[in-house]
């Protein structure tokens, strides 16, 4: 990922290609082809030409690919300072917003914290609703000084922080992205987590990325509208397991017609999970140039170039593990007046569970309870056996109760669950299983 090393390697391959071509031309000259018979001369020229252009062409193509990677690294990532893991985890705020006129980076439609174990890559996705209100900011932060009692402005929500910050950019001295900085401070106040990095995804450009990898396979549980009823292209994605192109994947992730914000958040998580699981290194290598072009136009981030290798390694580790999710949405959280202490406790518990710490405690408690219950059941069974009369010989056995088939899970807006009971993909220990 070193741009200097990539440039040196690129120039080296180009020089090697020129040198290789010169070597074959010189070998052809030393062979004195004009002294050979016509057929032999044509054969020698053909073999030399094939070897010259094939080898030199391969080297030049390699130089081109390296040049694409270098340009991608320069345009996508900065040269900022690396930030170490907080309590063994990297917390990255992922934001999605429209690229329409006057909207890029202003009002993110979706906000998700990817909390990643620095050793194992085990990932917890913490989603925040855009309509969250009445939340605090970290002590000493810019927004904390402006709103010491929390963000309680009438009609202002979490996704409005960026707009407020851009209107008061003078408060964020030296910041290139005041809207992002304000949003990060809000997310840190809500979750109690300190962010390492952030990434802003242009949702319109997301279509090109999906097309670059050949589409994504998703389980469509209900008809999902593409566009709005008044759009000329309005149609539906029909139910079933389908490979969707960029346009359909984008609408699968963001459609709200006949749905709600929280069902949409659940579908967005399913898209994230599918992309992580289905985009293999082989697919990425095969479509590298397309992916690089789409990604550099789609994502703005403060992840430094020196950290890219680390996050690629963590992503490869995450592919083989279950992704856990936590969404700070109803019915678990009152978005209009959240209990922040309770939210912090739920975030801490979800991280502990993802790391296995909660499971270890639960296993110990379960083992103790099972042992105590087994002792009690043994004594009770012995007493019942002594008191119960033996069954008469030849008596018919008592028929077992019929098994009642379980009802299929409710599906609302294309997601398992409902607004009143919550959506499975929003609170899950295995995101892939509920999608």
Descriptions of predicted regions:
Residues 60-435:
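Non-catalytic, solvent-exposed segments at the cell envelope interface
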Residues 4-11, 39-43, 288:
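Structural motif marking the loop-to-transmembrane transition
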Residues 15-25, 53-60, 309, 322:
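Alpha-helical transmembrane segments
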Residues 2-32:
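Membrane-embedded alpha-helical segments of integral membrane proteins
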Residues 37-68:
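Internal/C-terminal transmembrane anchor helices
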Residues 23, 27-37, 61-72:
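Perimembrane helix-loop junctions in membrane proteins
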